[in-house]
Amino acid sequence: MKITKLSLATIIALGSISFANAQNLEDAIKNVEVSGTVAYRYNDYEESTSSANANRSVGSYSSNNYKAAINLGVKVNDDVKFNSRIIAGNQDNAGEKVLNTQTEGDENFDVFLSEANFDYTGVQNTVITLGKQGVTTPFTLSRDALGNEATGTGLVATTHMGDMVSLTGGYFNQTNFDNNDSSSTTGGDSQLINVDGSESFAYITGTVAYAGMTLDATYGELQDRFDAYSVGIKGDFTIDELILAPYARYSSLDLDSTDDDNTLWKTGIQANLGIFGAYIAYGQTNEEGGTVGTDASSDSGMDDHWRVTLSGISDASAIYATVDTQVTDTVNVSLNYSGIDAGSKSNSEDQSEVYAQVAYKMSKNLSTYARLGQFEVDNYYGANDDLESTIGRLHVQYSF
């Protein structure tokens, strides 16, 4: 048997290399930021069918909905950071995996990289992001724990001028806007039907914050499709023990293919006093249309509660109202109402929903809620032939 002898110098050298590698690995781990969400939702809708059917209560729909997302941020050097987002869900729209429990079996999820970009912070008070990233504007929804996300490849720069003013400009040479949900699922229609994702998108946003108030204004243009702008204001005030959070926003989207100029304005306020809370909001669209963004749930749209969504509905007004109480530190109970009043030139019908919700926050990063209510749409199947639905939902979400 041959015995190999190692000199003291060799042993010290090998130990130094191992220690250096361990130090590099430790430093690399320290420089990695990890966050994300995991969400599960069960929907159960028992719906009446057309009055032409002998049994009007045979319609029903139930589904399991899943989505998991992990965000990774790695410091490359003092000026550069790499960001990525990995999603397990539906690759088509970076959304959730939906499994109909009545017509489909269990399936595995798509796992894909939805974001991969670099931040450059070498310019004072400025962040420049290059690569595939979320498109963050009032017209889009860039992140959602359970829903589609707007992404694209481009360059975004944000600069801060003191604590009050910031400016952001972005340009994308391609997006996934063709797979976004820009209108209500029960009535109304999106006018962004010819978007294929290859169109370039550019926007500029200015924000001013002062004395508890924040004012923002954004202009965006999707090549050969639309020009849009949105102006919003919100506040946060405390008067003794009363907390008030009012807001208002006006948005307009002008289609290039037609003379239609879609508008939607909305205003609302959240109030909290002790264990009690209340929320009320009102919105309205014009006769030409209510499509004012690529996603119905974006800031420019109005989708405050559950199935009643004003986005994409023309010549209509909506009201959303909630009262709630914090029963314990972990349990909140609320009663919610939503209603849409459609005008004579609307592309939809009157609709309303009322539901109760019990939310339970087991820990800082684990929450769940259960909902049960009633949803109705007038003349859904024809004249005097309404949709009536008993709706239920269970939602569980973990954040890290």
Residues covered by each model-derived region:
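Solvent-exposed loop/turn segments connecting transmembrane beta-strands
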Residues: S62, S142-E149, Q174-F177, D196-S200, ...
